[in-house]
Amino acid sequence: MRKEIFRGAGVAIITPFTETGVNYNELGRIIEDQIAGGTDAIVITGTTGESATMTDAEHREAIRYTVEKVGGRIPVVAGTGSNETSYAIELSQYAEKVGADALLLVTPYYNKCTQNGLVAHYTKIADSVGIPAILYNVPSRTGVGIKTETYAKLSQHPRIVGVKEASGDLTAILRLRAATGDDFAVYSGNDDQIVPILSLGGSGVISVLSNVAPRAAHDICQHYFDADVRTAAKMQIDYADLIDALFCEVNPIPVKTAMRRLGYDAGPLRMPLSEMEPVHAAQLDAALRKHGLLK
């Protein structure tokens, strides 16, 4: 039986900042709008949430606040990965303590450990907690990717239940599906590959698009699950321009800009991220207007 934390579209939610910290009132508003819009899970303190720029206190409080605000209505997945195993364990144990449903564990970045190192790292974290963990494979950012044989080993751990796959390599994803079996959940980490990964037996997407169009991301998945593949594929194609615009500069610059355009007090990007180039901002606005999100 597949060990899914959620099925469908989980939002890789932004973190609204002030000049001095996290804007929790606005985060709460965004969470409520996401739930009302059909999001299937909240994924907090990930790449899109600018977790790399958050202090330890901010990281912990964002997780605690989100769990409290969601109140069990949908799953909360907490990003607790680190390139220091001991710190990842501390964050993961904290997330479990405050009630997160699952962990999202990015591969250790910068140090570029071996595949044996990945197995040891993830096993030690999973052994330290009692809640499930989703691996996060994004080699374009971290400098290390999870190989097929490593997936096969890690999938045997009872608390390592799936992966957010953002490598973009569908052939590698096909191989990981074959190596891990049907009970290992695969979530697309790329909004332009929702339907392709669902076609390989995927469980859904951890989505940037969901920030601005939660119903669309949910519906793409739901149509596929309902065996209406034609409609799911049509929606994937129809939203390609908005997805392209949300990634025309490095994530989360465009999506945070988009959230401001939609009336959210998303606050500043934290340095070294910078504001969008005007030509890309115009592309983003055009896509938002086309889909009726911006007047």
Task: Show which residues each predicted segment covers.
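Short, amphipathic alpha-helical "lid/cap" segments that border enzyme active or binding sites
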Residues: 28-31, 148, 281-288
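Catalytic alpha/beta core domains of metabolic enzymes, predominantly
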Residues: 127, 141-247
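Active-site beta->alpha loop and helix N-cap motifs at the rims of alpha/beta catalytic domains
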Residues: 2-11, 15-143
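C-terminal alpha-helical cap/extension of soluble enzyme domains
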Residues: 8-16, 37-39, 199-202, 206-295
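Catalytic cores of TIM-barrel enzymes
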Residues: 2-5, 175, 184, 259
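Glycine-rich phosphate-binding "P-loop"
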Residues: 137, 159-160, 270-271
